[in-house]
Amino acid sequence: IMKQGQENQVWIAGGIGITPFISYIREHPILDKKVNFYYSFRGKENAVYLDLLRDYESKNPQFELHLIDSTKDDYLSFEHKKIQKRATVYMCGPLTIMKPLAKQIKKKSPMSELIYEGFKFK
């Protein structure tokens, strides 16, 4: 599905929501789109695939990795981040994180296409 998105993409993963992005990265070693990837996690011990992500970034100049450790940094927010006018935004993570981010993104860039998979832990 990410292959069909706009030329400018934003990927957002919260915690274990990184899984579908890792699957895509493994299947597509070279990117043909500009991607800003935001990966939010709670503590370094919960951050998975960091070596893979850094390696992917080093091999793909169009892939920009942003790591957000919520134990050290503020929570991920798009209040002050630039989003391309017609970007495709893919999000996967807990609904408590994804819903507020989706609102911020739509407010900031109403023409962006937003595709997300949120989940709740029971």
List each language-model region with its residue ranges.
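FNR/FR-type flavoprotein reductase catalytic core
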Residues: 1-122
